Design a protein with these regions (language model features):
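Membrane-active amphipathic alpha-helices enriched in small hydrophobic residues
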Residues: 124-139
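Alpha-helical transmembrane spans
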Residues: 116-120, 134
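C-terminal assembly and membrane-engagement modules of membrane-active proteins
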Residues: 1-115, 138-237
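The transition from N-terminal targeting/processing segments to the mature protein
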Residues: 108, 121-125
Length: 237
């Protein structure tokens, strides 16, 4: 009797599989079991040129329309259009090796190095390099900030050799997107603090990211125009 009860309990716990309209279900909660589909591994690269070469090399093998999505200022993903099961294959992904310019405060020497190594030279970098080159380390400091300009008479920490009106905003072009496209120029808020040092803060609300995405999309339009016109490649922002 006990053995029959155990057999009954075991049979009740056994999962039964049903085929309904070509789909596979389990009897517990009728959860769909998706079929296994062999998919290619996503290839990761760091440049837009590599994406173009991969698409041209493997387009015929893919056998369907390819979607190029500019996801952000430093990321591009390439995927197929809908397959027969309404899924997509992510084929390639590009991530820019762009250091960018960290927002926040840093020391004078670090600021000098970052302006020379992380930014494309322009009027903004020339102004900042000249300003920083006239700073010294002394024993006291006084500041006057009216919200438009900041005046620093510096004699301690980050210090100036004279009373100078500091521009509150400067235009900089840090390396923030793929090197194959133009680096966007944007406003940065400049702050000088006797204790914290030199501060750079983005001041354009992220508009530069939209410009970077447009530059990336334009790169693909220029380098894969024939495939785009033929409807084989679609570029999205």
């Amino acid at each position: 009797m006990l053995a029959k009860m155990i057999d009954k309990i075991v049979s009740l716990k056994e999962t039964k599989i049903f085929e309904i309209d070509g789909q596979t279900y389990a009897d517990a909660s009728l959860t769909r079991i998706p079929p296994h589909v062999d998919r290619p591994d996503c290839i990761s690269v760091s440049g837009l040129d590599s994406i173009c070469k991969l698409i041209r090399t493997e387009l015929e093998k893919v056998g369907t329309t390819i979607m190029v999505q500019v996801k952000s200022n430093d990321t591009v993903e390439v995927m197929t259009t809908y397959l027969s099961d309404f899924s997509r294959n992510t084929l390639y992904r590009a991530k820019a090796d762009a250091p960018g310019l960290r927002t926040g405060f840093r020391g004078r020497e670090v600021a000098l190095i970052e302006l020379r190594s992380l930014c494309i030279p322009n009027e903004g970098t020339a102004y900042l390099l000249d300003l920083l080159s006239r700073m010294t380390n002394e024993n006291s400091v006084s500041t006057n900030d009216n919200g438009v300009t900041q005046t620093v008479e510096a004699r301690q920490g980050v210090a100036l050799n004279a009373v100078v009106d500091i521009k509150p905003r400067v235009m900089l072009r840090p390396f923030r997107t793929f090197l194959e496209v133009e680096q966007p120029e944007s406003e940065f808020l400049l702050r000088v603090d006797p204790d914290e040092g030199i501060g750079f803060f983005e001041a354009d609300g992220g508009i530069w990211k939209l410009e970077a995405k447009k530059n990336i999309a334009d790169y693909f339009l220029k380098n894969m125009g024939d495939l785009i016109d033929a409807g084989k490649v679609v570029v999205m922002q």
